Each structure stands twice: as C-alpha cells, then as structure tokens.
A protein has these predicted regions:
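PLD/PLD-like phosphodiesterase catalytic module centered on the HKD motif
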Residues: 1-154, 184, 191-318
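Secondary-structure "cap/kink" motif recognition
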Residues: 165-171
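Short amphipathic alpha-helices and their capping/turn segments at secondary-structure boundaries
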Residues: 158-165
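Short acidic, Gly/Ser-rich segments with clustered Asp/Glu that frequently serve as metal-coordination loops
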Residues: 179-180
Length: 318
C-alpha cells in the first residue's frame, strides 16, 4: 500500500529543514517517500518545488532531486491552494477530497493545528516533528509486511493493499507459474482472477499496461490457442479493456524454467514488487486462503533477474 502525501511548495523552506541537524529530517521524509509514499503535488508549481530544492545544502539537495526524479509522484487533481492558505483541517479535506490524500506535512510553527498531528476523517495532518510517528506511513508499512489471512475479504485486499499502487503505476508485470493453468480451468466455470483484477482497474479508470509471464504446465500447445481466443474474442471486445488497458501481453515459458527461476509469484507495479505466496490465484472465485504477502522496492528482490531469464526463454507470446 502507498501513502499519498502532500506538502506545499513552501514547506522545504521551513525553519526546521534549515538547521544544522536537518539532514536527519530530510532523509527520514525521503526514505518514507521511497518505501511507502507517493507525493501528490500541483503540476503548475513543480518548478517552485525544484527551486526550493536547489536552494538547500548541496548534499540534501541531491537527495531531493533523486526523489523527485525517481520516486512515485502524481499531479494533484483538485484546484490547488497552498496548505499555508487554509484556516482549518476540514477546509483542506474538503478542497482536496478528489485527491484522496492520506497525509499532509506542515512546518512545526504552523498554526493550522495545535497538536503535533491530528486526523480529520481520513486525512492525517502532521507537523515535521510528528512524521516519524505518522499513522499513515505506519499503516502502509504494516500492510506491506502483513500476510493475508484466511477469510479476508478480497474486496478489502484490493482496496487496502492494491488500490493506490494501481492508481500510481503505469505498468503491471505478473510472474505466476500457474496463472495460465488456473485461468483456463476457470474460463467456463467461474470468474477468472484476471477479470477480478481488470474490473478493479476499470473502476479506478486507470490506464495501464499489463504483462504476464506464466508456464506451459499441463499444455501440449503452450496454451496458445485458448489464450489467444480469450484475449482476442473476449477481452479486446469490451469497451473497458479498450479504454483502460494500454497494452496486454502474455508470455508462456517452459515449466522447467519456473522450477529453476520463478518459483515465487510476483506482481510488480512499476518499481514496487508484491510477492504473493499463492499468486493471483488469491483473486479466484474461492474463499480467500492464508497467503504470504510482502511489498518491497524492486531493488530489494530478485524480480529483475528472474524477468530477464524468462524474457529470453519464451515459447509463445500472445
């Protein structure tokens, strides 16, 4: 799960971010952004943010420039006003409601709230001193590390663990040894897991590219005929698929390769990798079973090396 957070273009000029020990605060915010966050910012003010960054100590400025270049961020949908112009937390929540913000960070000397932090309905507002104890980031960390329990609601899993990852990603890459086998089994019997995921993407009106790597286990023709027919005669004929799925590709690899390279099952959302013990079978039309679960930065996983190996050894591409 991601925490969608915001600070206005004046925040980086705060007194506490210009002190001798400020590098600790800067690093903490940047690390939380990297691991669990997505910055929501007004596109019209992007240059103002960079101007403030360039005015910082060079060592700190370099860290922020990396963050703005590589970490997850998304333009603000609401009509923008600087946080410093608001009188109450409720005013902020109402103005920024369409952005579904989780957290706003404000300077320590802000009069917007009297406490170090407060939560108004679903929006947490935290002064700099409270960022270490942010409930939003703590919740994101917990959901990134907590396994899925038997009987959990699949709709809750999608909403709490995947919604903001999907909202803030351009490419989903799935590595799941048994996806093709399960999908073919489900086509005529129940709603396939893939359709559950696609319907959720459609509900978010998110345009995204999807790539799936799976094995040819129990298939004489590498599932080419049945999957080609499904993609071309079922998926591509729907309005939602045409509207929101920018590209869709299925790669079939020999099952022996998965035994060696891809035993674990992954869903990558750009540079965030979800490891799912049961793969996307968790979304099949069955009661939810116990399932190991984690989300990590792609550089802390073997995802890229496994993907490279699979990409070089495809038996069929659909």
């Amino acid at each position: 799960m991601l925490t969608e957070f915001h600070f206005d273009e004046f925040y980086l000029g705060s007194d506490e971010l210009d002190s001798e020990n400020a590098i600790f605060i800067h690093k903490k915010i940047i690390d939380l952004w990297k691991d669990f966050g997505c910055l929501v910012y007004p596109n019209i003010k992007k240059s103002d943010y960079i101007d403030w960054v360039n005015g910082l100590d060079p060592k700190i400025s370099k860290l922020w420039l990396v963050a703005f270049s590589h970490y997850k961020k998304t333009p603000m949908a609401s009509n923008y006003m600087p946080v410093s112009d608001f009188q109450t937390p409720l005013d902020i929540e109402e103005t920024y409601s369409s952005d579904e913000l989780d957290l706003i960070i404000i300077p320590n000397n802000s009069s917007l709230i009297n406490e170090i932090s407060c939560t108004t309905h679903n929006l947490e507002i935290s002064k700099t001193n409270g960022i270490i104890d942010s409930t939003s980031f703590a919740n994101s960390k917990s959901l990134c590390e907590q396994d899925i329990a038997e009987g959990d609601s699949i709709d809750d899993i999608l909403d709490k663990r995947f919604k903001k990852l999907i909202k803030n990603s351009k490419v989903i890459t799935i590595i799941d040894r048994y996806w093709a086998k399960n999908h073919v089994e489900d086509i005529s019997r129940r709603k396939p897991a893939l359709l559950k995921i696609l319907d959720f993407i459609y509900s978010l009106k998110q345009k995204i590219a999807i790539t799936i790597y799976t094995s040819n286990v129990d298939s004489a023709d590498d599932y080419k005929e049945i999957l080609s027919n499904y993609v071309n005669l079922t998926l591509k004929r729907t309005v939602n698929f045409s509207s929101f799925i920018l590209s869709f590709e299925i790669s079939i690899c020999d099952d022996s390769l998965f035994r060696e390279q891809g035993h674990d099952r992954y869903i990558a959302f750009d540079d965030k990798v979800c490891t799912l013990g049961r793969g996307i079978a968790i979304f099949r039309d069955y009661p939810v079973p116990n399932c190991t679960f984690s989300i990590k930065d792609i550089n802390h996983t073997q995802f890229n090396s496994i993907l490279t190996k699979l990409s070089k050894n495809r038996k069929a591409v659909i």
